[in-house]
Amino acid sequence: MVVVVILGGSTFVLLNSEGEGDTGQPQNYSILSAYHGLDQLPFAASLLCGFNVAGDDGMPVVFSVQLQDESVVPESFLVIRSDGETVVPNCATLHPADEHLEQRTVLLTGDFGTYGETPHRVEVTGPLLTLNGEPLLGLSTEDITPLEDGPRIVLAERFAPDTNGLAGECPNGTAQVIQLTWEGGVTGPGNAALGEEQRLGTLMLLEDGATVNPLALVDDDPDNHVLACLAEDSPAQLVEVHAGLFHDPGDDANPATQVVVIDG
């Protein structure tokens, strides 16, 4: 059974199969964010799609669950602009956020309303599947971050340092790793590598009440995931990042942002 619930402009799909292996618990999936990050994608973005998308708008869409790569196709998405025009994206891809613990951010490209009009709604209209094969048809959101705004953190997951996909990422002495998922790709100002300013502006509230900075920020590639390596054993409960430190590809800086840490 599929139940669609609309709350605060976003649509959630509750899935409860009555077949073999049913757990009896509904599974709740959602679109965490849709981020109108760029109005003129550079030619280099074409490498992500396999064909020329230079000049397209770019909009990363982050899901609450990991996705099957084979199900991520343009025809599974629809963008509705503020002028009412509907746009099927030119490209839909999990690149560049395609590492083992990522695979939840779909980059959409197309004409999403740069000149006077804006993207109003994103819908899943085709057979998009979770990593476990659950359908996400019907998910949607109208909570779209506008072009002029900077990125926020939408998900923080806690992992052991030896988790598959994290080997060798963090320095010696790391006790836990917090994977931070941003709305869009982040670097330092002017596409600079992340450094001390970003590390010291990232605060972790631990279960024992202490507030600490990460030992290091790693996975410094051009996607929307950053790994915060913590030396402390007490589990991280909340992450807070000061404003103006993490910039998107358009060089828009983040607002102050915080999110509760969950088990990955």
Regions found by a protein language model. Name each.
Residues V3-L15:
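Hydrophobic alpha-helical membrane-insertion segments, chiefly the h-region
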Residues L15-G264:
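Non-catalytic beta-sheet/beta-sandwich ligand-binding modules that flank or precede catalytic cores
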